[in-house]
């Protein structure tokens, strides 16, 4: 597919996404609200995106105002939806849950529109991250040339429906994304960045080429069978733990935006018990079990690329 077809399809899918999000807003707004609870987190200011987070103060909102904030949040996809002082590199987060009473027919209608919305989100992400063929550092320019001010992470995030949950409780998760990669994978990625011939701020084009060339040399010097890992820290994330009494099952969901709980009237489903998201303080985090990690040596800091050392 040529570049212009790809851009046209991206713009078309995004227009469809805006329509389905509006339809979802209308559908949910017409349903009887039985409870709503959302947790506002501090905005991340420009220039502070990479600072370690040690404390987060949470503000709780309930009822109709929480529902209004939650429904608005699903449609906050652009930078102009937030203040000028807020970082464009940090996604907006509004954990919480909106609980609606539904008939069986209403549930099916809502599930259909949520499914369609999530399919469009997944397709947009695939177009931008895979089909464009661009390395990550060039995607920003590609997206903002055609969808100016789009916050991609907010756009990609899926909407999570819950059916007749018994309780929804909230907490915080600290973790790393760990991925095994091959020497060839990394060299291919670096060659693609080198051949693109563009500057990536704050570097000039020549400085960027020099940096990538040094990284390629470092990787090429490794033995072919070297075990490599990308170990990237993820900033502390709000999560929801959902309990289903009938199935005796707990499901944990990432919760960057409100979950949508549907309580079926015909089934006599009761209002789920709702927990609170408490303030985060890194000093009070307790690890239930922390296994010994294999020793690693940092090779390419920019990519969080490590060499696994033999014990």
Curated annotation (Swiss-Prot):
One Pfam family from the record: Ter
Alphabetically ordered keywords of this record: Cytoplasm, DNA replication, DNA-binding
GO molecular function terms attached to this record: DNA binding
Subcellular location, principal: cytoplasm
Any GO CC annotation of this UniProt entry: cytoplasm
Location relative to the cell: Cytoplasm
Listed InterPro entries: DNA_replication_term_site-bd, Tus_dom1, Tus_sf
GO BP terms, alphabetized: DNA replication termination
Role description: Trans-acting protein required for termination of DNA replication. Binds to DNA replication terminator sequences (terA to terF) to prevent the passage of replication forks. The termination efficiency will be affected by the affinity of this protein for the terminator sequence.
Family: Belongs to the Tus family.
HAMAP family found in the cross-reference section: Rep_term_Tus
The protein's name: DNA replication terminus site-binding protein
Organism: Yersinia pseudotuberculosis serotype O:1b (strain IP 31758)
């Amino acid at each position: 597919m040529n570049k212009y077809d790809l851009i046209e399809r991206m713009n078309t899918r995004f227009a469809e996404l805006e329509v389905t999000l509006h339809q979802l807003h209308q559908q949910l707004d017409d349903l009887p609200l039985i409870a709503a609870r959302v947790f506002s987190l501090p905005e991340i200011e420009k220039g502070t995106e990479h600072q370690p987070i040690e404390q987060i103060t949470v503000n709780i909102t309930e009822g109709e105002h929480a529902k209004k904030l939650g429904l608005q949040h699903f449609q906050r996809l652009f930078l102009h939806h937030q203040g000028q002082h807020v970082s464009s590199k940090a996604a907006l987060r509004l954990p919480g849950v909106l609980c609606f009473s539904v008939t069986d027919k209403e549930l099916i209608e809502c599930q259909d529109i949520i499914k369609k919305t999530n399919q469009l989100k997944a397709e947009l992400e695939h177009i931008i991250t895979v089909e464009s063929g661009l390395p990550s550092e060039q995607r920003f320019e590609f997206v903002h040339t055609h969808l100016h001010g789009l916050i991609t992470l907010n756009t990609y995030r899926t909407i999570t429906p819950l059916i007749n949950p018994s309780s929804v409780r909230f907490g915080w998760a600290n973790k790393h994304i760990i991925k095994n990669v091959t020497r060839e994978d990394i060299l291919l990625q670096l060659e693609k960045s080198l051949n693109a011939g563009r500057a990536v701020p704050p570097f000039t084009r020549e400085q960027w080429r020099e940096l990538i060339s040094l990284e390629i040399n470092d990787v090429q010097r490794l033995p072919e069978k070297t075990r490599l890992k990308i170990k990237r820290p993820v900033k502390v994330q709000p999560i929801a733990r959902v309990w289903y009494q009938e199935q005796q099952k707990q499901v944990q969901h990432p919760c960057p935006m409100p979950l949508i709980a549907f309580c079926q009237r015909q089934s006599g489903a009761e209002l789920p018990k709702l927990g609170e998201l408490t303030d985060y303080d890194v000093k009070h985090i307790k690890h239930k079990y922390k296994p010994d990690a294999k020793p690693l040596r940092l090779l390419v800091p920019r990519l969080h690329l490590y060499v696994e050392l033999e014990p």
